[in-house]
Curated annotation (Swiss-Prot):
MF GO annotations: homoserine O-acetyltransferase activity; homoserine O-succinyltransferase activity
Catalytic reactions on record: L-homoserine + succinyl-CoA = O-succinyl-L-homoserine + CoA
Organism: Azotobacter vinelandii (strain DJ / ATCC BAA-1303)
Residues flagged as site, Important for acyl-CoA specificity: R325
Name the record gives this protein: Homoserine O-succinyltransferase
Pathway(s) this gene product operates in, as recorded in its UniProt entry: Amino-acid biosynthesis; L-methionine biosynthesis via de novo pathway; O-succinyl-L-homoserine from L-homoserine: step 1/1
GO-annotated cellular components: cytoplasm
Primary location group: cytoplasm
Residue ranges annotated for the AB hydrolase-1 domain, each copy included: 51-360
Assembly mode: Homodimer.
Amino acid sequence: MRLAFPEDSVGLVRPQMLHFSEPLTLACGRSLSDYELVYETYGELNAARSNAVLVCHALSGHHHAAGYHSPEDRKPGWWDSCIGPGKPIDTRRFFVVALNNLGGCNGSTGPGSLNPATARPYGADFPVVTVEDWVHSQARLADALGIQQWAAVIGGSLGGMQALQWTISYPERVRHCLAIASAPKLSAQNIAFNEVARQAILSDPEFHGGHFQEHGVIPRRGLMLARMVGHITYLSDDAMGEKFGRELKTDQLNYDFHSVEFQVESYLRYQGEEFSGRFDANTYLLMTKALDYFDPAAAHGDDLAKTLAVARADFCLMSFTTDWRFSPARSREIVDALIAAGKNVSYLEIDAPQGHDAFLMPIPRYLQGFASYMNRIAV
């Protein structure tokens, strides 16, 4: 048992849940008659309710962004390096809200939830959700918490897309937007990677058309392959070379197709197997489609500057030099559009070898720049 938490930790945290009974109409044309959102909070909301920060998660993220659920927990929340006393999102100043998005598999209504119309798990019948849908549901969460305006909406990768969408859908409710390792829309290559991952899941015999829960099975192999493909794109070539090179697990080659011979093979298989035991296959499909569909400028003739003209927030964009999934050039597209739209924008490009996953890591230059911007936010 852990005797004490680090001084800069938010410590023990407890997930909370809110039930929403007002129907939510989705971009796909369907609606959810009622739904639940699981969330966590860190820090204290001030009397003026002016210090609230929303943290939006990426593809495999969830509401547990910081702290520990139990003294026995070996690892803290997924963004613990950035949230806590004295950290970039300083909980001595800010009241932080992190949630699990609709369609997720960590407590919020999603494919694993019971469909009230059938009393069986939604499975593949859960509606396709978009980034815009998530933002609308997050706005309802803010209403329920009595938060009329966020001091900042922050996210990395897919989370950064949500932060951008907030400034478009609810411009008057966001003072600062921080989009980290993100993009204004996916490239064809990124959509292609997502499609390969989806096909790995869809072609797994245990998927059963998305209703695998009713068969008492999990499409582990499909999920494993999807995660392996995705994980390769989250790392840089340099990082993989530095960590694994061509190192073998044993001293010899086996000259077959079934043995795990290289350390990088072992790593990918471990990541895939671990992921397949904790993530929902239908949620993976939904998250990748939300990524594919995000393209707010499409409604404005592909003019991103025109799209962002409605925003009232100040912006901070950060990218990482070796991120080839959402390269610095994609962040600079957003920066250029914001400048063209006459918005206040700060941009930091961090030299880091870790690739796309760098936004999750305690890289000194990243934490320094992140904290510097957050310290400028008046509460």
